[in-house]
Each structure stands twice: as C-alpha cells, then as structure tokens.
Regions:
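Active-site-proximal loop/hinge segments that shape catalytic or ion-binding/gating pockets
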Residues: 2-58, 72-109, 132, 137-289
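Intrinsically disordered, low-complexity N-proximal targeting/linker segments that flank membranes
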Residues: 68-69
Length: 289
C-alpha cells in the first residue's frame, strides 16, 4: 500500500478535534426534524468528486499530455530541476504576488509541492471561474487526499497575497482528510441546515451553488498524479458554449489564411478537446458540439 502523503498524515493527526465539533453539531439535530437534511448533506458530500476548473487551452494540454501539471511541474520541466535557486526564481515569476503566500501555505499544511488543487463537485456546472470543469476520480476517491473549507489562497490571503488575518489555528480548523469531507462540509454549510422550515428537504441546488464559488467551495487536494484515465467527464461552461456558437460559424467560414490571422485559439482548443475526448471515450457536456 502506498505511503500516505505528509499532508494527509498531518490532517489525520488533527481528526479528533474535527470529530468533536461534528458530534456537537449532530447533537443539535438529534431530536429535530432537520436531521434528514443533515443526512442528505452528508450523503451529497461523500458522493462528491474532484473537479478542476481550467481554461480550454489547459484542458487540451491535459488531454494531450495525459495528466494534470502543477505550476511547479511546468517550471521543473523548463529549468530541469525541482529545487534550487533557478527553480525557486522561475516559480516566483510564474506565481507572482502569490508566490510567498503559496510557499507559506504549503509549508503550514505540510504539502510537498506536488499537490493538485481541485474543488468538490456534487452536481451542476461545477466551479464557475474557468472555461471548463474536468471531473476526475473515475476509478474512485483517492484515499490520501485532503480538503479545505474555502479556496486556500483567497481565504487565507487577500487579493495582494498578504495574510487575511486568520491565525494558523483557524486555518487548520478548515483543513481535513478527504474521508472527513462530510464533517468539514457540514460545519461549513451549517446555514443550509438551518434554512427555512425544519421539515423541508435539503436545498441541493443551493449546495451546488456554494460549491461553485471560490469563497464557499470545498477545496480538494490530490497528492498524487491526476491522469487522463481518471477523467470522468468534461463540462464546458454555459457562458463559453453561448459565445462559442458564433465563433464556430466565423471559423467555418474563414479561409486557412484568415484562421491563422484571426484570434481563433479558443476555437481550436475547443474543437481539439472534443476530438481528443472522443478518442478516449470521455463524455463532454455543455457547449455546442
């Protein structure tokens, strides 16, 4: 059995505190008509999948390369090493103002620099800050993954990459193993449990909406390779599908020379995604094709 990541081992060591907070929450609903709502929330969170929001160009690159590359992976391939002054400098240039924030955060959470950042997906379009959402874990949930209540960078740091005021203890209260995502999520989304009449069912649409937004999503960290073979589905954002319809018409009508001169990079990536996904029998939903 593979050795668990340092981040997972670190998160697991703090599990007792999270479980105590979760037990306290459950006691609030012990003799309450809202208990089925809590059960539905737990079930939805446990069924969730890892979703990575990305540009069309990045999605095409993933399908061609066979795996998701982190910023550190890209930099390492450029400088020929994963450590040393040249690597650190190149990574700082790529991450810009968030470089020190990322270094601090990954040190605090015991990451090894190889973590892939995803979001928990329980339905809908998925995270709304990219052109497409790639769902992973076709073969099942990674056992040594970790999770975080919120987007680590935007929750712990401000828009300039400076600390947002959370103490290390407060940050760690948001961090857990993937197996505890239902406990962490139930505490993070307590408002959903308290909304409306106690006997009304869980508002699954509201949960999906919360999981789409950076400030309220549940971040998932995969401390291993994310491969094309793990892709379950690719979801093209609705906003991209609407704009792509007109671009495809212009692309079809353009000559070869015009296609080279005009800004059709996103169209080419869009078409390549469908072609590559079809070869690998990966469903692509949304868009216009």
């Amino acid at each position: 059995m593979p050795t668990p990541s340092r981040a997972y081992t670190f998160a697991r060591a703090q599990r007792d505190q999270l479980r105590q907070r979760y037990v306290t929450l459950r006691r609030c609903f012990r003799n309450d008509t809202r208990r089925p709502r809590l059960r539905a929330l737990v079930d939805a969170l446990l069924r969730g999948r890892a979703a990575v929001s990305m540009t069309l160009a990045t999605c095409e690159m993933v399908l061609r390369s066979g795996r998701v590359l982190t910023a550190a992976d890209v930099v390492a391939s450029e400088v020929g090493s994963r450590s040393g002054p040249a690597f650190d400098h190149a990574l700082e240039l790529r991450l810009k103002k968030f470089y020190m924030a990322r270094v601090h955060l990954e040190s605090l959470l015991h990451f090894d620099g190889k973590a892939k950042y995803a979001a928990l997906y329980v339905g809908g379009e998925g995270p709304d800050y990219g052109a497409c959402c790639v769902l992973f874990e076709r073969g099942g949930v990674r056992t040594d993954s970790t999770c975080f209540a919120g987007d680590t960078l935007t929750t712990v740091f401000d828009a300039e990459g400076n600390p947002a005021g959370l103490s290390s203890a407060e940050v760690l209260m948001r961090f857990a193993t993937r197996q505890d995502v239902h406990r962490l999520g139930s505490l993070a989304y307590r408002d959903i449990l308290d909304d409306g009449h106690p006997a009304t069912p869980l508002d699954l649409q509201r949960l999906q909406d919360l999981l789409c937004v950076r400030d309220t999503l549940l971040e998932v960290h995969v401390h291993d390779d994310l491969l094309v073979e793990d892709i379950q589905r690719i979801i093209i954002a609705r906003k991209v599908g609407r704009s792509m319809a007109q671009k495809l018409l212009r692309y079809d009508d353009a000559s070869v020379a015009e296609r080279q001169q005009m800004q059709f990079d996103d169209v080419r990536a869009y078409l390549a995604i469908h072609e590559l996904a079809d070869k690998r029998k990966i469903p692509v939903v949304g868009g216009t094709c």
